[in-house]
A protein has these predicted regions:
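N-terminal Rossmann NAD(P)H-binding glycine-rich loop of SDR-like oxidoreductase domains
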Residues: 2-39
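Non-catalytic, hydrophobic alpha-helical segments
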Residues: 25, 85, 232-236, 260, ...
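Amphipathic terminal alpha-helices
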Residues: 40, 329-361
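NAD(P)-cofactor binding segment of oxidoreductase domains
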Residues: 78-149, 158, 164
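Conserved beta-loop-beta element that borders a ligand/cofactor-binding pocket
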Residues: 162-192, 202
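Glycine/proline-rich active-site loop of Rossmann-fold NAD(P)-dependent oxidoreductases
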Residues: 174, 188-202, 239-257
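A conserved pocket-lining segment of Rossmann-fold NAD(P)-dependent short-chain dehydrogenase/reductase
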Residues: 203-230, 235-238, 250
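Terminal hydrophobic/aromatic helix or amphipathic segment near a protein terminus
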Residues: 249-250, 257-313
Length: 361
């Protein structure tokens, strides 16, 4: 194994275990980290030989172990053998989180756990009040009043596993250094071995093409924050490098909570951008945007009402302040044409489809 110093960090002899490599976030994060530090020894948990083949084709030196998030004993063992565990898989799987913590806590040396949550955790107020499509002025941040984020109610999405990670970073603070990365709406194409597609905006685009018109939930005034997947991956890279550097300059444990975001957007605006572009590409006939109810949105995709109709606003102060992280990629709006074209391709919908369907071409 060749040792390389990247920005003063020598990563030789560090071993990392990762969960979620073939997913959208994990695929891009691993691509970014492996490009910066090819000398790191990686172990990847994959579900089956098909997934394993895709990882091996792009990363032939990666050690593969086969199992899923229910393979508690395997995850515990692999975590015990790792210096750093990057958890990019299901943010709501309690068993996997417990297994990782158990494995890391059993080590005599200090290790690091970088877990992925999501700002869906901030949706609970609108869900509780059954309010969809209305704007909220409440903006969380990960620096001032961090306890507001780390003490959200237990029924908030992702909160149960967040608590497992936060508790581990407190009870085992001497041996298990934890960080939670909490991304908002993610956009852009991933460069991982399997899934290059995000969810919220692509799903909105898919449904727009299939419905033949744009739509938003309720009044369409809901706010979310957003981040390009490549900018998100840079945050993971900086945390991995901090871990290799003995933890500095990052904070860990109770203060190891990192939002990532570029800016806020309004879902009604995104709906219009998508509809306008879909019409421009000849995929729909009219770019008017209709108002859908909560039930209609949920009928289009799981959690449609929440992810398009509830508010989730956050500021990434900690990563900027401590890690020097800054988003640099294209804006969400700038990526809409490619997203529309990609979703049309996935649906086997050719440009000019709307005119053909109407008998005008």
């Amino acid at each position: 194994m060749t040792s390389r110093a990247i920005e003063g960090i020598d990563a030789d002899q560090w071993s990392l275990t990762r969960l979620g490599t073939t997913g959208f976030i994990g695929g891009e994060a691993f691509y970014t980290i492996s490009q910066a530090h090819p000398e790191i020894e990686w172990t990847s948990l994959v579900r089956n030989s098909d997934k394993g083949a895709k990882v091996a084709a792009q990363y032939p030196k990666v050690r593969l172990v086969y199992g899923d998030l229910d393979s508690a004993s395997l995850i515990e063992e692999e975590s015990r053998n790792a210096d750093i565990v990057c958890h990019w898989a299901n943010a709501d799987h309690e068993g996997a989180a417990h297994a990782i913590v158990k494995g890391l806590a059993s080590k005599s040396s200090t290790s690091y756990l970088i877990h992925t949550s999501g700002t869906g955790i901030l949706l609970y107020k609108d869900i509780d009040s059954n309010t969809y499509g209305e704007a909220s002025s409440h903006v969380y941040n990960d620096w001032d009043n961090l306890s507001d984020v780390t003490n959200l109610p237990d029924h908030a999405p992702h909160r149960v596993v967040d608590k497992i990670i936060l508790q581990a970073g407190t009870e085992h603070a001497d041996k298990v250094k934890t960080a939670i990365v909490c991304p908002p709406t993610i956009y852009g194409r991933g460069r991982g071995p399997d899934n290059p597609r995000s969810h919220q905006v692509p799903e909105l685009t898919r449904c727009t093409i299939q419905q033949g018109h744009g739509f938003h939930v309720g009044a369409g005034k809901t706010y979310w924050s957003n981040v390009h997947v490549q900018d998100l991956a840079q945050c993971y890279l900086k945390l991995v490098e901090a871990a290799i550097n003995g933890g500095k300059p990052a904070t860990w444990g109770p203060e190891g909570y990192y939002f990532t975001e570029n800016e806020d957007f309004v879902w009604g605006d995104v709906s219009q951008w998508v509809a306008t572009e879909a019409k421009k590409q000849g995929l729909i006939k009219d770019d008017k945007v209709q108002s859908f109810t909560k039930e209609q949105a949920d009928g289009l995709t799981t959690w449609g009402s929440a992810m398009w109709g509830a508010n989730s606003r956050a500021r990434a102060v900690r990563a900027r302040k401590l890690l020097g992280w800054e988003p640099k990629c294209a804006s969400l709006k700038d990526t809409i044409p490619k997203t529309v074209a990609y979703e049309a391709q996935r649906l086997n919908t050719e440009p000019g489809h709307a005119a053909k369907a109407a008998g005008e071409a």
